Amino acid sequence: MKLALISAFGVGGATIAGVIIGFLFRKVPHKFNDAILGFAAGIMLSAAILGLIIPSLEEGNVWVTSVGILVGAIFLNLADKLTPHLHHITGMDQEAHADRQNHLNKVMLFVMAIAIHNLPEGIAAGVGFGSENINNAITVALGIALQNIPEGMIIVSPLIMAGVAKKRVFFIACFTGVIEIIGTMIGFGTVSVAKAILPFALAFAGGTMIYVVSDEMIPETHSHRYERMATYSLLAGFITMLVMDFYIG
């Protein structure tokens, strides 16, 4: 429980750390942003497979795992219908903003999108610790935390462009981080109480992470003509997580 709580604050705090970096480097070049986000996508994809999907297969069977992955993806697909895709917002240029009210409307949608996507990521980290396999849990939590840093960085620019005060931007970032902490404790608590759902819960969490990588992160990294670099960055992130998991395990 103590380790899960520490991890929860670490995962949520990584988003805030990213926001602080975003304040320091407000105008991050698309090339650099795509490389960092691609690297984070690779880490997240590797963590989902190594820390969630493979353990789900070991705890259950291929059918439970397959259904869990699919249900996790469908869950986020339904959530996406309530919020805009992150790459539709983070890639906006100033000339695309019609007026201040339009800015603020998009900001609120942006915050909702981040929060909704952070909840299942937090649940994924919590489910990992609920499985009592600490090595796999650390792999997942570390992968999510590393992914949250560039995600926190990209929160800053759209909010400032919309005219939101710096203090309020920081408060909003804290809110999205708290959502992830709550998600971690929900995942840990649910699996701890009902061990029978562990294989499904692991696969569900893995499915949500893969969906985020495919539906949000990869399109964002491929939207500024740096696709090749983003692809190699993703591979680098995947391999990095693979090596880290090998030594952690």
Regions flagged by a language model, labelled:
Residues 1-249:
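Intrinsically disordered, metal-sensing/regulatory segments
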